[in-house]
Regions:
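FIC/Doc superfamily catalytic core
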Residues: 1-380
């Protein structure tokens, strides 16, 4: 059973846009379109990319049992001592950098090539081994140690399957399937090819995000899909393997997998919409409080600083506001006095926490079934 799956050439021969898939597809596409519009209400796109990519990085890494805390991640951003950052946090931060790098490579020409995928994996794992084969890549059942699937062990097959996948991703004439259905197929195919020695899962989930960008379903890499996968981890791995176990007679299993991904897109997009609305409300609140306090010294860079850096420090404020260090320190102290930041001393360093913004992300699980008025109660 471990080796019988024959990775298919794409496109698949099945009619995968069944009635059930089309119904769920409509819901998912509507939510994505709404998210795309809501994201444009945040004036500085880098705030959303930075904040949401970090959450995606943390949850995608958690799928692989690489666990860190939000506090560790934010503290790493203000620490001058790289040596004290724990290994899990470093891995998550590398993942975020991989999202950034991948996004910059695809946003202009809208091509998600194998070279881009290699660069993403290189950033995730800090190596440039490229596509390879290895018996150690066999996937095992974590409970009993059985080998449940062995990816291709012939490098020519890996290269051929990745070339076919690259065409399927980028050649719109190769398949007229809806992009979200294609994304589900792409993700499964990549997981089965397993082209790298390590980092396949995380790289594959970044490919999902970048695919939404190259197909113009989103302008920014902000769909927070890994949280859904983390919450449904057992089902995620079960459905991936179910397609392999049925081998060629697996149209039903493909439909179930596609429905799972589409439901994830709908749920995740809905949650992210509410989160973006919460950030927008909070930014407006801070602006209303700080404008009269700073008067003529107020600049939009002030708000950008507080939301781009949930944990900020004097050097960041000095750089963003283009002021002297002493002035930057005074600015931060004023914001603390206004109740919008909390000052924390660690060793010889001071950093300043945007507590309301951090609370918004800490309460993110609660946003799943709540409306904007509830978000307002969380951020106040």
């Amino acid at each position: 059973m471990a080796n019988k799956y024959k990775i298919p050439q794409l496109p698949l021969s099945y009619d995968l846009e069944t009635i059930a898939v089309l119904k769920q597809l409509n819901k998912a596409n509507k939510k994505l379109a709404e998210l795309k519009g809501v994201a444009r209400t945040i004036p500085n796109e880098n705030i959303l990319i930075s904040m949401l990519a970090l959450q995606e990085a943390r949850d995608s890494s958690a799928v692989e049992n690489i666990v860190t805390t939000q506090d560790d991640l934010y503290q790493a951003g203000v620490s001058d001592n790289v040596r004290i950052i724990n290994p899990a946090t470093k891995e998550v931060l590398r993942y975020r950098e991989a999202i950034f790098e991948g996004f910059e490579m695809v946003r202009k020409n809208k091509i998600l090539s194998n070279n881009v995928i290699r660069k993403v994996q290189e950033k995730v794992k800090q190596n440039n081994a490229g596509f390879l084969v290895s018996p150690s890549k066999a996937l095992v059942n974590q409970t009993d140690g059985r080998v449940i699937y062995t990816p291709p062990q012939d490098i020519d097959e890996v290269n051929e399957k990745m070339s076919n996948l690259e065409r399927f991703i980028n050649d719109q004439e190769m398949s007229n399937l809806d992009p979200l259905v294609k994304m589900a197929i792409i993700h499964h195919q990549f997981e089965s090819i397993h082209p790298f020695g390590d980092g396949n899962g995380r790289t594959g989930r970044i490919v999902n995000i970048l695919y939404l960008v190259i197909t113009d379903l989103l302008d920014l890499p902000i769909l927070y899909l890994s949280r859904y996968i983390t919450h449904h981890k057992g089902e995620y791995y079960y459905l991936i393997q179910a397609i392999r176990d049925k081998n060629t007679d697996n149209a039903k299993e493909w439909e179930e997998w596609i429905l799972f991904i589409l439901k994830g897109v709908e749920e995740t997009a809905g949650n992210t919409i509410e989160l973006v609305k919460g950030i927008s409300l909070l930014m407006a609140e801070y602006k209303n409080v700080l404008r009269p306090i700073f008067d003529k010294a107020y600049k939009h860079e002030l708000i950008n600083n507080l939301f781009f850096h949930p944990y900020t420090k004097i050097e960041y404020m000095q750089h963003d506001m283009m002021v002297q260090r002493k002035t930057a320190a005074k600015y931060l102290d004023r914001i603390v006095e206004a109740g919008l930041l909390e000052k924390v001393k660690k060793g010889r360093e001071n950093y300043y926490i945007n507590v309301k913004l951090c609370n918004l992300f800490l309460h993110y699980n609660e946003l799943s079934e709540q409306k904007t008025d509830t978000i307002e109660s969380i951020i106040k």
